[in-house]
């Protein structure tokens, strides 16, 4: 057996489809999804993963209908203010928001910044990508590299990703951390997020550990 992935990317997807198929309220579907994301984070931490980057919203997603965005924002605020504090130790866990903060509503930003302030541990990192755009990330890394006098590869705030889980069968990264995912093990699930169980996550990590990760070598 090889090591568990150090850094997992999570692309929660399919809440709108799930709500339509189950005749449910969109906000309720996203809140249920937030609970599932939290369960996945707890499981990954238990399995030895040290960092998880969660794709909450791309900048392109901000063009969606207000009804859809309001549901995402409401669920995200529950995630930051209730679910994370209930399941993680602030002395162990770090929460970081990545993306264009100026494009996010005040309530969302306050909830995220509250979690960032409260959670500053060094054992497990939760990166949340919101209003994120890869072009912005590269440009920001370029500026940071010039300021620090370092190589641009050392100026990215988020490191290399070993495994990506998307909770839909569409084989797309949708702009998720393209520089960091160059050699990531990509998993596209047929099980919707709101029906995903932790034993399935355990299986995915166990299967990853069966093979050496050569990263092009």
Regions of interest found by a model, annotated:
Residues 1-217:
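Flexible, compositionally biased loop and terminal segments
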